[in-house]
């Protein structure tokens, strides 16, 4: 018998049967070995056939196992296993049956048919399970769909719909699909296109996360509920699994063969199946090799003739990039555009999904949490779409609450650690026999007993609360199942079952749930089982870094005293500090314009008066780190072409993929302080980019993505008009100086730029008393650096006055002070420390001697 007369699946089964016989020390491969190999084969063609004939496959497999155990064993056969005469004659019978059926190849099911015809032990066993030649022959016809086996891969391609698609209508019947709320217009338009005579193929287009797949799931649910026109009743919606279609297609043409078998089966169904292709663009170019046809071209004839009812789904960008490039494919589809739902629609969607998420996480989701998820995600997450981003917030918040319920509460955990600590101490003291140790041990034993008593009480409360929560969950799960059963009964028209569920089981469960919820409403001391708006805000803050959670008392106090904190580092600039503090307070109190940055300021004034220092202090105040500031040195943007570095290079230029310096920094950290230093040195075209940022709080980068600046503080610094400040400082008040400076500034910057800045702040030149305060701050930093090396620095008033006097320069502000400290304090100190004059741990006193700074112990 030639092996190449068998299909590839059957050949693999024969190899498996040989391995099985060898492993069990059997001398011959018997028909039973091959039958077991066929049943155990991955993607076995025999199993679905037996299931169709109502055979208990597991029981048959165990009976075959018993037959294998009865076969004689021969040790030392050395891998030489041959076909038994029974199997040889069975193969000849298979060949005869295949020829009778006009098959070019012998397939696995022919072996089953031949085994029943055969008079051997395998045939007897199969007949015991109620299998007859007639029954098996009819089942084979049904599975093959009237086709002959003319291809060695015929078995792999058979029942392609079962292998390569997922039945959405079946999943809807089982209640596995989430409910679809709203989207009636889009579903109606999809049904309308499907009802056409030709080109009845809608393609659902929308941004990622707006609910394209949900529309098809909604269609599947409407079909099983008979809420569709007559033409669509009883149809099945199958989702094409592209992964399964491509996976394992090793040889050229194998992918096309699989797709062709799917299309052939769909054609046979005569329009009873609607094929859903998610990510439709993947079909264009799929399977394309040199000189071969891609999947998109294979679909075209079936789509044009109306043989294939297809619903596609893809994003706008991918539709433009792949589908529109192929006009022949594009014209066969009808577009159904899906827009992002409004916040109100999203709230309705979330209310519909609420029960599913409650059941999954075993927590309760409150209505304020749903409203907060929709509104906060809409405001603060700008690069994603509703309802997806709102659902994510609900899901993660519920997950965090569940995690807290499952893990030990913090109070219990702390007590447990304390008990362990006391037990270790008790163990150590029990080995000591002096009076002090015994006294301490007695106190310790008392404390340990008290802690263990507290722990036992708390643990009891925790277990009781957990039990109360799990009780409601079981009732909720039973109620959900009862509602699903009611739907099934309603579709089947089973009125008895419907009345039993609707008027008996469901009201009873609802009553139980109310009672359990009332018991649960007693104040929980350890566990939280409700997702509230506070949890949603917390999750959002973790995701984006934007503080939207309710302020604690400590934070309110901190914001009210913000000026004091800023004044500790920024000396003598009362107006600037007030302006910045007011902007931050407006933002945290929720009063600032949601469509503009938190604040945009132009800091003007001479060099070294604290313009940049105020930005650093603000970043430190908001984020506890100066590094949280996005600093852009505008002197780097003096040429016109350098503007592209801020927002990213346009398409076609080198660096297009990298994104812009400013836009990428803000995308990563939407809540930040942006410092545009020395802004007057930049090219005038840079200010055209800033207009959008200052007015609408948004900027489009080189790749067309909109970057949200609404949660940033934009601060620009400039030295313009500093000469006017120096000239008029003595004779004019603050308002007069500001007018003089703004006169110079308005000549340099365009009116539309200045008009968009919230506040232009003029900084005062620093006086002698300011420099002295700054000297104290700078010496405190030096003291901190020395303390890290175990030296204690002390400075007397005389030395401080001298440093302030040497470092004072009305033109250059506080910067000369830094140099004065370096030259008069740091340099001599460094020499003395290296020479070993001061030892670690010793105090260093700075005083004045002969008009110079002198360091002594």
From Swiss-Prot:
Residue ranges, annotated region (Repeat 2): 83-146
GO molecular function: ATP binding; ATP hydrolysis activity
Alphabetical list of Gene3D superfamilies matching this protein: 1.10.8.60, Clp, N-terminal domain (1.10.1780.10), P-loop containing nucleotide triphosphate hydrolases (3.40.50.300)
Keywords tagged on the record: ATP-binding, Chaperone, Coiled coil, Cytoplasm, Nucleotide-binding, Repeat, Stress response
Predominant cellular place of this UniProt entry's protein: cytoplasm
Single GO BP term: cellular response to heat
Location in the cell: Cytoplasm
SUPFAM superfamilies listed in its UniProt record: Double Clp-N motif, P-loop containing nucleoside triphosphate hydrolases
Region of interest: NBD2: 555-765
Region (NBD1): 159-340
Pfam entry (one): AAA_lid_9
Record family assignment: Belongs to the ClpA/ClpB family.
Protein's job: Part of a stress-induced multi-chaperone system, it is involved in the recovery of the cell from heat-induced damage, in cooperation with DnaK, DnaJ and GrpE. Acts before DnaK, in the processing of protein aggregates. Protein binding stimulates the ATPase activity; ATP hydrolysis unfolds the denatured protein aggregates, which probably helps expose new hydrophobic binding sites on the surface of ClpB-bound aggregates, contributing to the solubilization and refolding of denatured protein aggregates by DnaK.
PANTHER family: ATP-DEPENDENT CLP PROTEASE, HEAT SHOCK PROTEIN 104
Record remark on domains: The Clp repeat (R) domain probably functions as a substrate-discriminating domain, recruiting aggregated proteins to the ClpB hexamer and/or stabilizing bound proteins. The NBD2 domain is responsible for oligomerization, whereas the NBD1 domain stabilizes the hexamer probably in an ATP-dependent manner. The movement of the coiled-coil domain is essential for ClpB ability to rescue proteins from an aggregated state, probably by pulling apart large aggregated proteins, which are bound between the coiled-coils motifs of adjacent ClpB subunits in the functional hexamer.
NCBIfam families membership: chaperone_ClpB, PRK10865.1
Subunit structure: Homohexamer. The oligomerization is ATP-dependent.
The protein's name in its UniProt record: Chaperone protein ClpB
Species of the source: Vibrio cholerae serotype O1 (strain ATCC 39315 / El Tor Inaba N16961)
Phylogenetic lineage: Bacteria, Pseudomonadati, Pseudomonadota, Gammaproteobacteria, Vibrionales
């Amino acid at each position: 018998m030639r092996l190449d007369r068998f299909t590839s699946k059957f050949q693999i089964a024969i190899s498996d049967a040989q391995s099985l016989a060898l492993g069990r020390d059997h001398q011959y491969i018997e028909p039973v070995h091959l039958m077991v190999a066929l049943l155990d084969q991955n993607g076995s063609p025999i199993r679905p056939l037996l299931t169709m004939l109502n055979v208990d496959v597991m029981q048959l497999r165990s009976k075959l196992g018993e037959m294998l155990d009865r076969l004689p064993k021969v040790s030392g056969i050395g891998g030489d296993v041959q076909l038994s005469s029974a199997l040889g004659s069975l193969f000849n019978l298979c060949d005869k049956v295949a020829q009778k059926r006009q098959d070019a190849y012998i397939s696995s099911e022919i072996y089953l048919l031949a085994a029943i015809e055969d008079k051997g032990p395998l045939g007897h066993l199969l007949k015991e399970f109620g299998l007859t030649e007639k029954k098996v022959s009819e089942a084979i016809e049904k599975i093959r769909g009237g086709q002959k086996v003319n291809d060695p891969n015929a078995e792999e391609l058979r029942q392609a719909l079962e292998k390569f698609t997922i039945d959405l209508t079946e999943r809807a019947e089982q209640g596995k699909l989430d409910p679809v709320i709203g989207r009636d217009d889009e579903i109606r338009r999809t049904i309308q296109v499907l009802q056409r005579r030709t080109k009845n193929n809608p393609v659902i287009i929308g941004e990622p996360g707006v609910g394209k797949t949900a529309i098809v799931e909604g269609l599947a649910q409407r079909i099983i509920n008979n809420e569709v026109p007559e033409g669509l009743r009883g149809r099945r919606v199958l989702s094409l699994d592209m992964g399964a279609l491509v996976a394992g297609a090793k040889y050229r043409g194998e992918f096309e063969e699989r797709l062709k078998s799917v299309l052939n089966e769909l054609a046979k169904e005569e329009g009873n199946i609607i094929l859903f292709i998610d990510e439709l663009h993947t079909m264009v170019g799929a399977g394309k090799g040199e000189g071969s046809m891609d999947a998109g071209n294979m679909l075209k004839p079936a789509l044009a003739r109306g043989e294939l009812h297809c619903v596609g789904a893809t994003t706008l960008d991918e539709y433009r990039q792949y589908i529109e490039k192929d006009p022949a494919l594009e014209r066969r589809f009808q577009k159904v555009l899906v827009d992002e739902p409004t916040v109100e629609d999203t709230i309705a969607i979330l209310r519909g999904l609420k029960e599913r998420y409650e059941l999954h996480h075993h927590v309760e989701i409150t209505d304020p949490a749903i409203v907060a998820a929709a509104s906060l995600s809409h405001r603060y997450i700008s690069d994603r779409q509703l309802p997806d981003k709102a659902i994510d917030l609900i899901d993660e918040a519920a997950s965090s609450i569940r995690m807290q319920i499952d893990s030990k509460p913090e109070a219990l955990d702390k007590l447990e650690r304390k008990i362990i600590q006391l037990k270790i101490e008790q163990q150590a003291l029990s080995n000591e026999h002096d009076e002090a140790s015994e006294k301490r041990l007695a106190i310790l034993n008392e404390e340990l007993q008290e802690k263990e008593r507290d722990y036992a009480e708390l643990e009891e409360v925790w277990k009781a609360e957990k039990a109360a929560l799990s009780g409601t969950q079981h009732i909720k799960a039973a109620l959900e199942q009862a509602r699903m059963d009611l739907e099934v009964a309603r579709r089947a028209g089973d009125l008895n079952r419907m009345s039993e569920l609707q008027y008996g089981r469901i009201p009873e469960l609802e009553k139980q749930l109310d009672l359990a919820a009332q018991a649960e409403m007693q104040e929980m001391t350890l566990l939280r089982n409700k997702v509230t708006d506070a949890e949603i805000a917390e999750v959002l803050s973790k995701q984006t870094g934007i503080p939207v959670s309710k302020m604690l008392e400590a934070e309110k106090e901190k914001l009210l005293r913000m000026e004091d904190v800023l004044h500790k580092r920024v000396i003598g600039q009362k107006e600037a500090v007030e302006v910045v503090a007011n902007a931050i307070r407006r933002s945290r109190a929720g009063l600032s314009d949601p469509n503009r940055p938190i604040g945009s300021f132009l800091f003007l004034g001479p060099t070294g008066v604290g313009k940049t220092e105020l930005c650093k202090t603000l970043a430190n105040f908001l984020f506890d780190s100066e590094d949280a500031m996005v600093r852009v040195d505008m002197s780097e943007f003096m040429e016109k072409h350098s503007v592209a570095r801020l927002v990213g290079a346009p398409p076609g230029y080198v660096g297009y993929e990298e994104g812009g310096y400013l836009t990428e920094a803000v995308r990563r950290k939407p809540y930040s302080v942006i410092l545009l230093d020395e802004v007057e040195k930049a090219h005038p075209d840079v200010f055209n980019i800033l207009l959008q940022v200052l007015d609408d709080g948004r900027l489009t980068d080189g790749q067309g993505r909109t970057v949200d600046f609404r949660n940033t503080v934009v601060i620009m610094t400039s030295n313009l008009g500093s000469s006017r400040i120096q000239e008029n400082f003595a004779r004019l008040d603050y308002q007069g100086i500001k007018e003089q400076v703004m006169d110079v500034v308005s000549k340099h910057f365009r009116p539309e730029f200045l008009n968009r800045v919230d506040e232009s702040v003029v900084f005062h030149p620093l006086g002698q008393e300011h420099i002295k305060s700054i000297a104290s701050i700078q010496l405190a930093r030096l003291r901190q650096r020395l303390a890290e090396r175990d030296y204690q620095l002390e400075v007397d008033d005389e030395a401080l006055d001298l440093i302030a006097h040497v470092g004072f320069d009305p033109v250059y502000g506080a910067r000369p002070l830094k140099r004065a400290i370096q030259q008069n304090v740091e340099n001599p100190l460094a020499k003395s420390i290296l020479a070993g004059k001061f030892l670690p741990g010793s105090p260093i006193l700075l005083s004045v001697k002969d008009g110079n700074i002198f360091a002594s112990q």
